[in-house]
Amino acid sequence: YCGFFQNGTNQEVEDHYVDCLIQELEASADSPRLKDSIIHAVFIGGGTPTSLSPQNAKRLLQAIQTCLPLANDYELTLEGRIHDLVPEKLDVWLANGVNRMSLGVQSFHTDIRRAVGRLDDQETVLHNLRSLLDYNQCAVVIDLIYGLPGQDMKIWQEDLDLLIQSGVDGADLYQLNVFDGSDLNKAIANGKLPPAATTAYQAGMFAFAKEYLEKRAYRRLNICHWSCSNRERSLYNTLARSGSAMFPFGSGAGGGLDGYSTMLHRAIQPYEMFVEAGKKPFMALMKQS
């Protein structure tokens, strides 16, 4: 149910990829178009960047600080998963510029989570979120998905209740999409999981959540994102939707600049080949209409 960048890895592959990503950042650092800009938001998305080793995360974050002309009130989001919220990683992220965490909870309900391949039970999810919040050094937002197999309206309300109780600064509520050929689609087709909710039922779940959050003073920042504190600015998403210049770095990254939309190579091998040859690893460059 995720159509974003996905690749398997091991430590050697990870080390080499981060080497190339840093090389790409360093190669762009002195370009006039980037050097003369001010970067207000950095979004390290995925994939699952929190899976990086502490050493590689530190190297990457320090390269971002060195190579990009960051505004003094910049937002630096690290996207990730609950399972990675361990002290040896948290300490590195927060000491090296991360000031916003976006985490894929999907559901707090243990059985629902396990059905879609999530490792941690409800107690662990809440414990790890609390561990991050106790640092008091970044905005914390989570993703919840509605329409998951076995997730009825009662469980959905429990998810929303736990969202409030968790104390996070905001949340994205996403409708489940089941892609043809995906593991989730196969599990449903084979009877291993119950069907996902219908579109009509999902619409009811969204309407319920909208009313539920509005009654609890949550602010709706865009069609699917809510904030409950001034700490959560959702700056990257706001700027992206406003047509601001976006500089892409890393395999599969997309951007837009001076009337052109860009996509960097999604496959690791050509991405690394172009970077090591001293070239920007464009897969596509299209003039915006």
Residue ranges with predicted function:
Residues 7-31, 37-289:
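C-terminal scaffold of the Radical SAM
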Residues 1-6:
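Local cysteine-cluster metal-coordination motifs and their immediate loop/turn environment
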